[in-house]
Amino acid sequence: MVMADGPRHLQRGPVRVGFYDIEGTLGKGNFAVVKLGRHRITKTEVAIKIIDKSQLDAVNLEKIYREVQIMKMLDHPHIIKLYQVMETKSMLYLVTEYAKNGEIFDYLANHGRLNESEARRKFWQILSAVDYCHGRKIVHRDLKAENLLLDNNMNIKIADFGFGNFFKSGELLATWCGSPPYAAPEVFEGQQYEGPQLDIWSMGVVLYVLVCGALPFDGPTLPILRQRVLEGRFRIPYFMSEDCEHLIRRMLVLDPSKRLTIAQIKEHKWMLIEVPVQRPVLYPQEQENEPSIGEFNEQVLRLMHSLGIDQQKTIESLQNKSYNHFAAIYFLLVERLKSHRSSFPVEQRLDGRQRRPSTIAEQTVAKAQTVGLPVTMHSPNMRLLRSALLPQASNVEAFSFPASGCQAEAAFMEEECVDTPKVNGCLLDPVPPVLVRKGCQSLPSNMMETSIDEGLETEGEAEEDPAHAFEAFQSTRSGQRRHTLSEVTNQLVVMPGAGKIFSMNDSPSLDSVDSEYDMGSVQRDLNFLEDNPSLKDIMLANQPSPRMTSPFISLRPTNPAMQALSSQKREVHNRSPVSFREGRRASDTSLTQGIVAFRQHLQNLARTKGILELNKVQLLYEQIGPEADPNLAPAAPQLQDLASSCPQEEVSQQQESVSTLPASVHPQLSPRQSLETQYLQHRLQKPSLLSKAQNTCQLYCKEPPRSLEQQLQEHRLQQKRLFLQKQSQLQAYFNQMQIAESSYPQPSQQLPLPRQETPPPSQQAPPFSLTQPLSPVLEPSSEQMQYSPFLSQYQEMQLQPLPSTSGPRAAPPLPTQLQQQQPPPPPPPPPPRQPGAAPAPLQFSYQTCELPSAASPAPDYPTPCQYPVDGAQQSDLTGPDCPRSPGLQEAPSSYDPLALSELPGLFDCEMLDAVDPQHNGYVLVN
């Protein structure tokens, strides 16, 4: 439900609930609505859940009170904090912590999946919060992406304990609750279950969602979803590491007793890659005994006393866990003092510039915390109390709404009397934090000179040149995750000469601001990082408002291997093909309507873009390697310049690139490298482009998907290039061995295999060509086939039966050594044969498309000396045991007849495309 905007003169001021001004609507349900409020004393934003008790039955009302009871027991940095409970006759108001950046569901929908390092940090926070709950015998039972919120610093906050319950070790629960995609199989089967094991399953689904951006179990209907959950089968995408896969599989085990426990998850190999630093919790933990007065924050108690709030009543409220106005103001003031420190991302390694070089600052901070007052929490002698803001006799405040409103919201708009104590003053609005702090910078008078050790110190030069800083920002932005600005702003900051516009937030509204917050923390509303600011402070804009100095963004140096990917194009690469937001939310239970949540088809996701981060790193380091060490051989010869459109240039360039490697050495490829990667390598104009981020991102991330037909054509083109290359190399080898066009070797001669590099071909093709239509099996060739000229007069030759006797001068078959070691280029078109002519005395046979006329096993060929040649050639070709014949002798009549029983074996033969190196021919190898 949305609050209606009536005319300004009809409104009596902002809508108020107790000390809270209602500023908007965050969410709504059947019996409750969540409003965004701001405390009028502390100026802190809160989320107020307004529940209409008159619409609830006894069972649901009991669940509401149980949720309140559970939230009162929980006090953890990664669990939404309960500040106050207000109850009237028909309404219940739950004031809780406000997570400014919303659900991680929406974050994944807008930004795509997280990388495993980010997912690990998020999952550690979830794990610590769930472990905290289980330690207090509380089970959540509804862990899902919609209930994982992100605060101002992109840290996890678990919300919505509406399905939470208490459990005892060994006792089973039976309530069917939760969201179907996250529900464990024992819930679908209607069995009793142990609460912690149920949360372990849900956390496994959550981890899968963080890493993959999709649900492991999903279906168009509830029965199909149930079937998939009970089978326990889910897809693992190509980008998931083996350790992460192992952890998820051990959590998503059908048998609850075999699932990992929280202690085992903490010790898992994937979790131990990066262990977060433990920090103290925000508030002191209540033990079995009641906390003493000394355990409360004296600074906050004194401040409340200066505001006219009874200190004794505040202490009693805290000890009794009343969660009234006194406790709420105390919690909010403590939050405003310390929340930014507890919400700071903690890293194990602190950079030297991030850490102050002296302990004097820490001692000053400790002294200021025990003696002084915060900056924006002013004492009366600073003349900053504004007691006139609140009525002096504001014992009762009316819950009033505008006169114009919709009927659906009428139940939440009735005026309720919420008693509020008398307060003589309030705090000023939070001041935007100063994001730049130099060593000797003079600060405004309302800011303390002391700062916490998280303060950043800039490098000086970067502050003066925005264009140079923006260039550095662009170069280092590539390795960082995408973050949204937490608030939509109106002011645009244009970088000089950069051509890009950045939107900056100058709203003075902040969750928590104090003296430490003002002194240079980067935490404001620019959540570009979840890590500690370190190493490089980069200017984003000049002063956008009088109250804000030049904001800096602190970025870590990027991985050099990933520098080729800018953040925007990494976002496109990380984002799944279908939007994560498309479809229903997991909380919607209308599964029978055929709507699919998270339409992430992982079977397609695993086959899209066979380009992995490994390939990019390998290609990049192959390019960087020769530049770093000139003695090394070129690492990627296949990346030579193939931009020329002429086929001859392509062939010659490919020969040059291949000749840089030995004959038996091939470029190392990734096991997962696909045809598309090879295609992109040929598309690459200059290998040096790999080191430039903006040019190579298009190569890897913007390549449109291609059909199977296009991939087949590219594959054929690659085969054609290989064939042309091998053909030219063989021709050069023939020339080297002094094999003339009309010459013919001796019958017993066997050619040695080429073992050395072959020079480029220098001999022109013979003037004879073969023009015959190709069969569909054969690959087309850009060049016409070359063959020896003595076959030109026997083009129409048919295979005739041979006599059974074979002379001693029968030609031997093709050596098996040649058949095995020749690469398989596409077969050439066969030469036609003339009917009635004698068969050629060849050491090979051309394979036609008619399989029955293929070469029979071990045919007997006549001697090559039957053909008339001139005297010079004849003297060179014939051996001592081969007599010269003056003319064409009579050839044997025919081959042996081929029986029909031998045909099946002939049809089963496999074309291995073995090459006859003497005549560029091909034979069948069975």
Swiss-Prot record:
Gene3D superfamilies: Transferase(Phosphotransferase) domain 1
Any Gene Ontology biological process: protein autophosphorylation
Compositionally biased intervals (Polar residues): 765-774
Disulfide feature: none
Pfam families xrefs: Pkinase (PF00069), UBA_SIK3 (PF23312)
Main location: cytoplasm
PTM note: Phosphorylated at Thr-175 by STK11/LKB1 in complex with STE20-related adapter-alpha (STRADA) pseudo kinase and CAB39. Phosphorylated at Thr-484 in response to insulin in adipocytes.
Biased composition (Low complexity): 644-659, 742-756
InterPro entries, per the entry: Kinase-like_dom_sf, Prot_kinase_dom, Protein_kinase_ATP_BS, Ser/Thr_kinase_AS, Ser/Thr_kinase_SIK1/2, SIK, UBA
Annotated residues for binding of ATP: 26-34, 49
UniProt keyword Phosphoprotein present: yes
Keyword Transferase annotated: yes
Entry annotation: catalytic residues: 142
Cross-referenced SMART domains: S_TKc
Catalyzed reactions per annotation: L-seryl-[protein] + ATP = O-phospho-L-seryl-[protein] + ADP + H(+); L-threonyl-[protein] + ATP = O-phospho-L-threonyl-[protein] + ADP + H(+)
EC class (word): transferase
Modified residues (Phosphoserine): 534, 587
Subunit text: Interacts with and phosphorylates TORC2/CRTC2.
Family, as annotated: Belongs to the protein kinase superfamily. CAMK Ser/Thr protein kinase family. SNF1 subfamily.
Protein task: Serine/threonine-protein kinase that plays a role in many biological processes such as fatty acid oxidation, autophagy, immune response or glucose metabolism. Phosphorylates 'Ser-794' of IRS1 in insulin-stimulated adipocytes, potentially modulating the efficiency of insulin signal transduction. Inhibits CREB activity by phosphorylating and repressing TORCs, the CREB-specific coactivators. Phosphorylates EP300 and thus inhibits its histone acetyltransferase activity. In turn, regulates the DNA-binding ability of several transcription factors such as PPARA or MLXIPL.
UniProt protein name: Serine/threonine-protein kinase SIK2
